[in-house]
Design a protein with these regions (language model features):
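Anionic-ligand anchoring segments at beta-strand to alpha-helix junctions in alpha/beta enzyme folds, i.e.
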Residues: 7-54, 91-96, 176, 180-181
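Generic, well-ordered alpha-helical scaffold segments in large soluble proteins
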Residues: 21-24, 28-35, 62-66, 83-87, ...
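Flexible inter-domain linker/hinge segments
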Residues: 1-10, 14, 100-180
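Terminal amphipathic helices with adjacent charged low-complexity linkers/tails
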Residues: 38-140
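Residue-level signal for the start and early helices of compact helical domains
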Residues: 36, 88, 156-159
Length: 181
């Protein structure tokens, strides 16, 4: 089908992700020692290139036997997370669902946002294959990034003279007036 499955040996956890977030996710899993640069992942991933309609059998077979699954979807409300939760209940699967509990409700899921979500999600489970040290290193790095960003916000920004945007119809008139002065 249109959706892709990538298996991994850490079989009791997994990630269901919107297709557009896959590349950033795999890059961040690599940083955490959970994937390699060829896209081989140690954590099973179901990539939803088509998010509607969801295929219940596909979702339930991915989640079956897993202690937990993280649903990564941008935007609010969390349509996929709700639908997947419904599919799991109907299939009577006890897989714990994570999503907006560890990821922001709104805004773009940048690399650092995804990393923080992964750290918060995986940090709740200390079982085989998830390296606590890598998680702590990434958490510390993110804390450092936030501190540096905060410090940068407090610096004075050099003044910028007013001007018209490229493509503005008023721009040539303004330029002509400046030339006449």
């Amino acid at each position: 089908g249109m959706n892709e499955f990538f298996g991994g040996e850490i079989s009791n956890h997994g990630i269901i992700v919107q297709g557009g977030l896959y590349n950033t996710l795999i890059r961040r899993l690599t940083n955490l020692g959970l994937a390699d640069s060829f896209g081989n992942t140690r954590l099973p991933i179901l990539v939803l290139n088509v998010t509607h309609p969801l295929v219940p059998d596909q979702i339930s077979s991915f989640c079956a036997g897993k202690q937990s699954v993280l649903v990564m979807e941008e935007g609010n409300p969390e349509y996929l997370e709700q639908q997947i939760g419904q599919i799991l209940r109907r299939a009577d699967l006890q897989t714990k669902l994570h999503g907006k509990d560890v990821l922001p409700l709104a805004g773009e899921y940048t690399a650092d946002v995804i990393t923080q979500g992964l750290v918060d999600y995986l940090g709740q489970y200390d079982d085989a294959g998830i390296q606590g040290e890598a998680l702590r290193d990434e958490a510390a790095r993110l804390e450092n990034v936030r501190a540096n960003a905060q410090a940068a916000l407090e610096e004075k920004v050099p003044p910028r003279p007013p001007g018209f945007c490229t493509g503005c119809p008023e721009r040539p008139v303004f330029s002509a007036i400046k030339l006449l002065k």
